[in-house]
Amino acid sequence: MDLPPASFSFFLPSVYDGTKLECRVHLPSMLQNIESATTWPNRGAIVAHPYATLGGCYDDPVVGFIGSELLQAGCIVGTFNFRGAGDSEGRTSWTAKPELGDYVSFYGFMLQYLHFLKLALTPGEEVDSSKPHKVSDGVKNRTDIHLILGGYSYGSLIASNVPTLDTMLDLFQFAPITTPTNKPTPMREIMSTAKRIAALSLEQIQMSHNLADVPDLRALTTSISYLLVSPLLPPISQFLTVFSTLSLNVKTDTPKGPHIPCPRPADQQSSHHTLALFGDQDTFTSAGKLEKWSDEMVHMPCSQFQFRMIDGAGHFWRENGVEVRARHALKQWLSEI
């Protein structure tokens, strides 16, 4: 079973340069009626698609079956088209830096969207926004919002390089409302869209709401995890970034917008629950290289990294029976985090 038709479709501006990105969200069955919605665990997941130049888009079949499994597990599943894919504006870059900005835009949307829903669905919960929030490395400790940062192939490369959660919260919490030319900043446009889609989601289950204009993203405890499907390793990953280190540039009307360094992917993936899912017949990265990398990640201090290698699976997951085994591995991991 693939992803069903989207619950909501919309466009977001990229924080990199304002490029319009085609986006959609799929709501799980628990959010179809008010009774089950109030007990929904507030889980979301992003699944980014493979390289647009080679035909990648959010309708990719691997994005579909991974997203379907996440949806069945109760996650709100969000997908978007990078620049140059589908009806998104622009074209694929040579450096992946614009695409990193695209992912960050949708990441920020999902954080705010889940935040709006959490406060609306648990109105009796006391939240003291004067206390500093706690970023959880896992969801075994109490957490209000859990977001899985996922991607397939090129999408996993971009997901691996996003800024830290603290940086993301600050970027969207303290974004200026307008640019010096009185245009809404991309971050504020994204927040407005998150509020609009949250309101539509609540109206769909006939639930009244009074959403804040600007959500306090630090009032709730948020945790993140990583899901990397057919991850790309050097030298392929280096070719796609022209051998440069990824960093985030944010659009402003000033000559030089904020430049945000990104953390080392290995540090983020070992310190948060992470699943790398790949086949032993991957044509882009050898099984030996993937196993060696995974073993090194597993043995980092206090690592929360896990991997599953699916026998007989290639990079495109078209071989007989491999999708079923991949779904089983993903379902097992989701039950553990």
Label each region the model flagged:
Residues 150-159:
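Gly/Ala-rich beta-loop-alpha elbow adjacent to hydrolase catalytic centers
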Residues 55-65, 287-288:
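The serine-hydrolase catalytic nucleophile loop
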Residues 270, 275-278, 282:
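Short beta-strand/loop motif that positions the catalytic acidic residue
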Residues 53-54, 90, 313-325:
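Catalytic histidine-centered segment of alpha/beta-hydrolase-like enzymes
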Residues 297-316:
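Catalytic histidine neighborhood in serine/cysteine hydrolases
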Residues 62, 92-140, 168, 172-191, ...:
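Alpha/beta-hydrolase active-site loop
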Residues 65-89:
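Conserved alpha/beta-hydrolase
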Residues 1-43:
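N-terminal cap/lid segment of alpha/beta-hydrolase-fold proteins
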